[in-house]
Amino acid sequence: MIHIINHPLIEIKLTVMRDEKTNHKDFKANLNEISSLMVYEILRDYKAKDFQVKTSTGSLANGKIFDKEIVIVPILRAGLGMTDGISNLVPQARIGHIGLYRDEKTFEAKEYFYKIPDVKKDSLILVVDPMLATGGSANDAIKSLKKRGFSNIKLVCLVGVKDGIDLIEKNHPDVNVYLAAKDDHLDKNKYIIPGLGDAGDRIFGTK
């Protein structure tokens, strides 16, 4: 299922990111902030565990603690730009990495790196990547995780288009997809339009 997270702060910060004049420092800062705002909503249905603590007054207070572990899995390299924003709100989360590159001729995703913490298979996995264009990278990352026994997976992207959304819904109907915005289409080079440019280059200032 697709979830578009609508919030004025997200829309304002996304506008800054779309602006071609925005430098990589501000681009990265706004991506971090949007990621934090999104995970607040994404974890709204998280089932926290009841827990009791003793306060400084000596009284007992009922509260909540994390139950299942949460693992943030950025798709390298652009996904790294969303990791800090999520872990700022969920510092207990562990971090894995999946490395995929896009074949410039076939546009297919190829895996070159996979490293996930040793956690229970029912842990909540947040796959993060700013752009959901063709959906190839996200689709392959999810397949890699499922092949290794993980089933509680959510996909978190900043901007997506119908092509990528349809691919994930077709191949992974059990995976909830979260977007800050749904854009219009892909151009002939498979870039999102209007989009925000090459997310990896704009995060790391490599272009």
From Swiss-Prot:
Superkingdom per UniProt: Bacteria
Protein's organism: Mycoplasma mobile (strain ATCC 43663 / 163K / NCTC 11711) (Mesomycoplasma mobile)
Protein name per Swiss-Prot or TrEMBL: Uracil phosphoribosyltransferase
Class of this enzyme: transferase
Catalytic activity: UMP + diphosphate = 5-phospho-alpha-D-ribose 1-diphosphate + uracil
Textual note on the cofactor: Binds 1 Mg(2+) ion per subunit. The magnesium is bound as Mg-PRPP.
Family from the record: Belongs to the UPRTase family.
Pathway given in the UniProt record: Pyrimidine metabolism; UMP biosynthesis via salvage pathway; UMP from uracil: step 1/1
